[in-house]
């Protein structure tokens, strides 16, 4: 299966300089995020509980835009919350029978808009599941600088904190996944999911 990073594959994207962003504003959600996501290592050990116990409904404001789109950034940062998505995106995920273990959705109500929107959670994949010889990393400041490593030990010795995955290869467990979120990169989407977004004119700004 072919995959695309959503920051390198436009999905009927507008050409604004900055993405549409939804700011979470309700205290319950903000306090929950602060209490559960202050330490990434602790978070990674409790990902499934994080989704299950997350508030069922959050409140948000659209920042510096007149209208919403189907795929938006979210603020503040929270591990594995990758976007705010429309009901249209939700229906596509369901129609393709994307495995529920690949994502979670929680409702967010956006001030001034009556449409249904959701926080999209994608579980973080740890590098123990990478097949390193076929993974390609690039420098976040200069993507012409490309790196490959024979294993996780070699990666750890050479990681300067500025490397991100550009091409990913995982073990067999993930071969039919549509959504992949490696810890050292951004979200990858399957070609069939991207194509379905194109077919349904999903209006998005890639993050």
Task: Describe these PLM feature segments.
Residues 1-207:
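Phosphate/anion-contacting hairpin/loop surfaces
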């Amino acid at each position: 299966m072919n995959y695309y990073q959503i920051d390198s594959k436009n999905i009927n994207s507008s050409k604004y300089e900055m993405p549409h962003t939804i700011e979470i504003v309700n205290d319950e959600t903000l306090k929950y995020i602060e209490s559960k996501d202050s330490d990434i290592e602790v978070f990674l050990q409790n990902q499934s509980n994080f989704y299950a116990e997350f508030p069922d409904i959050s409140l948000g404001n659209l920042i510096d835009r007149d209208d919403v789109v189907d795929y938006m950034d979210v603020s503040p940062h929270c591990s594995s919350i990758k976007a705010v998505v429309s009901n249209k995106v939700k229906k596509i995920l369901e129609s393709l029978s994307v495995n529920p273990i690949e994502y979670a959705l929680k409702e967010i109500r956006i001030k001034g808009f009556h449409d249904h929107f959701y926080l999209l959670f994608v579980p973080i994949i740890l590098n123990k599941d990478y097949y390193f010889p076929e993974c390609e990393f690039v420098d976040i400041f200069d993507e012409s600088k490309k790196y490959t490593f024979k294993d996780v030990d070699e990666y750890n010795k050479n990681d300067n904190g500025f490397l991100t995955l550009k091409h990913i290869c995982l073990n067999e467990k993930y071969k039919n996944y549509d959504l992949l979120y490696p810890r050292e990169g951004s979200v990858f989407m399957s070609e069939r999911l991207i194509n379905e977004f194109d077919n349904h004119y999903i209006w998005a700004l890639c993050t």
